[in-house]
Each structure stands twice: as structure tokens, then as C-alpha cells.
């Protein structure tokens, strides 16, 4: 048992003189401004894994302004990843104030706040004081992997998957929450007495934005806890018993687009309606306007997350994709298939930091474009195992097909193509399980700006790849659900009209060549699988 001690979190961030001079985080609402921007807007709070961001959206969907502030990552032990929840709150409030200050916005012109957040990150705090009893355990944290192994070995996988659409994994909240209750002195007893509150990061922001009046979450975040039944739309008593979680700690669950309450007036000078929330990937699906069954989006970040709208039935995936909740507006329920790829943009960072063949990430496209193809080189970026649809924790990255003629340009191109091949594998699984052809893939994230990658992606999946003008789709989704709740936008058709295309990449590669390359990729992929076990047996 560990006793964790935290200083009492600030309700407002401490601001030093340097911050005031550099970032202007403090807003004086009593002064008479020289100029004030007179436009109605939605404020999206985008709380991510490495930074807190605030983005202002106008009614036409354009971005008025952005503010961002990074926060500290904590790695107390190998495989453990934590965040200071107080720092998350203070940075999020700071950037919200900053973006209003930058653009001289009148708070009364902010129609609503929408929240999107890193999913699965788990936090418990004291209801009376608002103090976290432990650092937030981040979605990347693997400390409960052995607990998950034990649950799978005990035969609980089918029950959990049928109820939640998820596989038993340390990625999700349930075992993280149980770990906190079992390892913080007195936590379990206090939880059972109703003294503690559990939440994902959206819940933590709601709590602080309302001065502790609101303990709530939305359906998309609830669906990632491994405690919420996606069919009944309720916390599941059998799952709560399995993971030893007392019901007293749980937040209320609401549709993504919903008036949750309003902010404390002291935070921004006036109260602002809290119009919605959604986990980051579901928010991006909505931000990409994928509101009809069969529509899919892929986010290219450190990894890739592909979601496909599958409509009103929470169909199980024979290919072991996740079945998750899409944004709900209080009317019909919608679901999505999700496929996670662990390493995507991170492979470019490895080319830079690990191999040193590029000086900056932006160089990879021009280097890769300097050769016509990879000259038979394939790179399987299984540095952290393989995600969907392979789910092989023992796979490792491999680089095959090397000759004396191989250059760094061939390796750079193979790295980009390795991202696209992984996406194609997930898309194939979605096509197979849904029976939908999927003729268009909407894309966002940093690597979506890489034209070479996007063209190869279109070629290898045999479908259009569509890049939107506004690539801040995660924040846009949060803005949309909040704006729909308050009537800022009338309906989803209103939002569809403002969604605009930047560029469409049409498949150009002959089908025979696509088939040949995918056969070679599949051969390379097989060689990467179960590598750790093979290495162990060889020793």
C-alpha cells in the first residue's frame, strides 16, 4: 500500500510575472478594450496526452484562434505513465483564458464550451476538497497488464467483450481504477462511503469548471472504461463486481451533445454553457462529419486511430476490432468499429532521432520522393507490438529487402509505406466485418499533410483519401456537439454544409501492382510476429 500526498490543487492557475508578460493568461474583464472581436463562437477545450489546447470556432467552421500549453509527463517506473491532474486543469484553464485574451473576445459571445479529451486516462479525487488522491494513470500505462492476463486466463474475455465491445487490456480504465483503490491507503473504504469520485479527463474538467458542482461524463468516454454496457447504456453491475469498483465513485453519463451545466462565473468573468463532450477519436469522427454508416476516418498521429460509423447496432467484430460508441445526441444511438495502430508518425521520429537519416520530420517527404519506389525494402514498424487486427504484443519492428543498393531514401519511403500498409490492414478488417465497400477515407492528423503518404494510402486501399480544409477535426467535433446542444448549429446538415475538402487523392496504382506489394508486405509482417518469443526460445 502506498500513501500518496498531493498539495491542494488550485481552482485557478498560479500566474507568475513571466507568464503574464509572455502569455497574457490573465484576463481583466473590467478594463475597456481598445478593440473587441464581435463574433459568436464556440470554445473547444482539447485536452490531449502531451498538451492542453483551446480553439475558437466561428459559425462557418473556421478557426478564430488557438492556444496551447504542454505539461509534464511522469514515468515513475518502467511501463508506468502518469499526469499531474492539477497541472492538466491549470494548463487547460490557462489556454482557455489566453485564446480569449489574444482575440479580445467578449465572453458573452461564447455560445458554449465543448470538451474533447485523451481517453481512458484514469483519475480519482476527494469530493470534499477536489484533491486528487493519486496522479492520473495515463492510457499508455501498462502497470495492470498482469491483472488483465489473469482475467483473460480466468475466462472473462467473452463476457467483457459482449458487454463493452472491448478486449481486456490495461489500456482501458477498469484495472487502473482498481489499482488506485487497492494501492492508495484507505481509498477503497472511502470510495465505498461515497467520499471519492472517479472520472476520465472530461469529468475532471467538468468538476473544476463548475467548482465541484458537476460529476459527469459522456457516453463515448464511459464506453472506454470497460465498466459501461454499450447495449443497455448503463454502468454494468456484473462488470463492477468483476473489477471490484464501487458504484458510489461513478459519474453520471449523458449524451455527447447535452447541456451539462455552466462554468463558474469567476473563471471567465461570466458563466459559459457547457454544451458537450466526447473522447478524442469519437470527436474526430464527428468532426470529420462521418455521421452515416459506412463513413470512416483515420487520424495520423504518433499512432493511427481508424473509426468507422456502423450505425445503430453494436455489432461484434470477428476480426477483433473494437466496437465502441460514436457521439450520441440524445436521440438515436450510434456505434463505430475502431482499429488502433501503435506506431505511425513515431516511425518518422525514429528516422530522425534513432537513425539520423533526416534532421527534421518535415524532410521525410522530400527524401522519400527522391526515389520512385522502395526498391523492394519493407519496414514493419512493430516497435511496440502490433495492434488491430493482429493484436500481437510480441511482434517487433523489422526492415527487410536490403541490398548494397539500398539508400536512406529507400528506407524513408519504406517507413511511410509501412504506415499506409498498416492502415490498409485495418480497413480490410472493417470492410470484411461490416460488408461495406468503404470507397472514401477521411484523414486528419499531422501526417495527413504528407502528400506522398496520402497518395500511396489511396493507391494501396483502392479508395479516395479526402483531406479536409480544417484539420483540427478533434477540436471541431467538440465544438460541433456543443454548438448543436445550444442551437448554434441547427442540425448535422448545418454542420455538413460547412465541412470543406482541401484535397482528394484518387487511387492510381494498377490493381496487379497493389496486389503484388500487399503480398510482399504480408510476408514481411509474418516475419515480425511473435519475435520476442522466438528470441527467447533461441536463447
Curated annotation (Swiss-Prot):
GO CC annotations on file: cytosol
GO molecular function, one term: glycerol kinase activity
Pathway entry: Polyol metabolism; glycerol degradation via glycerol kinase pathway; sn-glycerol 3-phosphate from glycerol: step 1/1
Binding site for ATP: 49-51, 302, 345, 349, 446
Positions annotated to bind sn-glycerol 3-phosphate: 49, 119-120, 171, 280
Keywords associated with the record: ATP-binding, Glycerol metabolism, Kinase, Nucleotide-binding, Transferase
InterPro entries: ATPase_NBD, Carb_kinase_FGGY, Carb_kinase_FGGY_CS, FGGY_C, FGGY_N, Glycerol_kin
Binding of ADP, residues: 49, 53, 302, 345, 446, 450
Catalyzed chemical reaction(s): glycerol + ATP = sn-glycerol 3-phosphate + ADP + H(+)
Notes on how activity is controlled: Inhibited by fructose 1,6-bisphosphate (FBP).
EC number: 2.7.1.30
UniProt superkingdom: Bacteria
A biological process from GO: glycerol-3-phosphate metabolic process
Keyword Signal: no
Record's signal peptide: none
Binding site residues for glycerol: 119-120, 171, 280-281
Function statement: Key enzyme in the regulation of glycerol uptake and metabolism. Catalyzes the phosphorylation of glycerol to yield sn-glycerol 3-phosphate.
Family: Belongs to the FGGY kinase family.
HAMAP family reported for this sequence: Glycerol_kin (MF_00186)
Name of the protein this chain belongs to: Glycerol kinase
Gene name for this UniProt entry: glpK
